[in-house]
Amino acid sequence: FYAAILCLLAFIVLINFNLFTILLALASMPLAFTYPLMKRYTYWPQLFLGVTFNYGLILAWTSISGSLNPVPIIFYIGAIFWTLGYDTIYGYQDIKDDEIIGLKSTSIKFKNNAKKFLSLCYFFLIIFFLIGGYYMNFDYIYFGILVIPFIHLFIFQINKFRINDPKICLKIFKSNNIFGLIVFINILIVKNL
């Protein structure tokens, strides 16, 4: 019942966008409906979540511009790497239960190389956000402020991460709202200068 109400509300919002955005949003529906099943079939459900969850970035861009160019795709790919990292961390909270019932995840796949995998995810996040900022012609303020959340990722998250400590994993996972907020405020600042 609630799913039907939410779908109806989403549809009401959706019809207010331009046709291109509506078509892109409808094209994303298979992603949204199949994501919950991914842990049964692949070790990459976090990647699938990143592709699905961050699709809103593309929709936001097209709803404003009416078109699609490489810039939002660059930020989209960076955001996918971010989700891949933070949701892998989240997955370590219940990794033992997932293994017992036969579910799959990047947390399980990379449990012996977790910090390396997370570092790689965050490295590519940084690269894509830097490239995106360059193509948006953001000035030095964007790149300077961006150092703060990137330090947070590597100094706090990677350094403090403990695969067998669910409380630390949850704390690190939740700290991603700080990362996102700083990046968001940073973009607002440079776009309004």
Where are these regions (language model features)?
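Membrane-interface module
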Residues: I73-S105, K116, N192-L193
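Juxtamembrane helix-entry segments on the extracytoplasmic side of multipass membrane proteins
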Residues: G66-Y76, N137-G144
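Multi-pass membrane catalytic core of lipid/isoprenoid biosynthesis enzymes
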Residues: F1-L26, F81, I100-F143
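Intramembrane alpha-helical segments
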Residues: F1-I74, I131, L153-I163, K167, ...
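Alpha-helical transmembrane segments of multi-pass membrane proteins
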Residues: A32-Y35, G78-T83, Y90, P149-F156
